Amino acid sequence: MPENNPKINIVIHRGVNQIGGCITEVATEHTRIIIDFGNNLPSNKEKELTQEEISQLTNGIDAIFYTHYHADHIGQFALVPNTVQQYIGEGALEVMKCKYRTLSKTGDFMQELCALNRMKTYKPDCLIQIGDINITPYYCSHSAFDAYMFKIQANRKTILHTGDFRQHGYLGKGLKGTLRKFIGQVDVLISEGTMLGRLEEKVLTENEIKRNTAEVLKKHKYVYALCSSTDMERLASFHAACMETGRKFVCDKYQKSILDIFAKHGKNKSLFGFEQAFTYPHKETEKVIGHLRHHGFLYVVRGSQEWLIKKRMETYNDEPAYLVYSMWQGYHNGEEAVRLPNVMRIRDIFGNRIFDGTKDGFHTSGHAELQTLHDVCMITQPKTGVVFIHKDATSSPQYLHLPANIQVINNNDNNVEFIIASDNPLGCNNMRFGFEIG
């Protein structure tokens, strides 16, 4: 290969055969960046990276870009050496700081807070140049607020790294337009493939969850909703259902601070403004109790708030309380490694008075289902091929029914490395895929 033939190296350090723990490196001769540096999920039996391994992996890295703030994508951020610049969305950084400031009241999270204070931010649609690599973030719908996909350009080549995304959220309607207008055809598509291994999972739109929640609120006066405190679109569904039915949308001070960040950065103020959110006061008053007994409520709770639910149920006891379980089913009925005892105890409080997740229409995935994955491949038409990450080892893209001109770059090893230097494959072995200008 001629020495003056520029190339791009892509290394999937982790994520080809596992959901979460994603680490993807993109490098030219002069510049190296990493997309996401996440923790392994609890179900993963592999040992987590040590501080020494993280230092070795990031040695010579010019920047790390995070697609969003879920731990399986950003969890190692506090262990990254100070010499490596890290980037995340503006709203996402505020959420992270809010979370760790709250945690620091009961534990030592100084290392995390210091790392967050050093972290830089990017803006949607605004190019950032790191050496000879250009990175442009584009907003996408996910179960995390302020999530992005990245268009990466270098050496006249284009890579799209989707991060985690979906089309069935409120913000998902802009996906195809963004791909057609701002991305176009790419050389390599690096796409999440979570749902490739969940063919039977029911996928609802957030709007359907809103309608289902509204029906529950019409029938029941006191409803507790167990969900992620940072899932903006799910919380917007619950808030909208309360506004439609006249119920009060109730939360604690921490949740309200997260909602305020959503409202500050959210583009759709009517949906993401959370104007009617009611912060339950530290000291109850007869006025507050009377107000909520009269109107009824949907009370947003977290897995750590078993005590709060019991306390509120003692106060608001004139009618039975119900639980909207809006989380992954595996947290209560999965393998032991992924079950959350606090979630199971909260469910036990309500007995059979539970509107149960995906089964009953109150939860949906934060990840693209098969048709959306197919559509992204067809719109971007990757010249070299598509690599699916963030997927189980047994997942297969065969159900996408992609045309023959779209090559799925596959590898059975956890570490995949390949080079983009042309549109024509020279061949590959278990560890390396090579391409040369024809």
Language model: regions and residue ranges:
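Short, charged, surface-exposed secondary-structure boundary motifs
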Residues: N44-E46, M96-R101, A147, Y170-L171, ...
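Hard-cation-handling environments
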Residues: R198-P320, V324, M378, I389
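C-terminal regulatory/interaction regions
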Residues: Q18, E244, Q276-G438
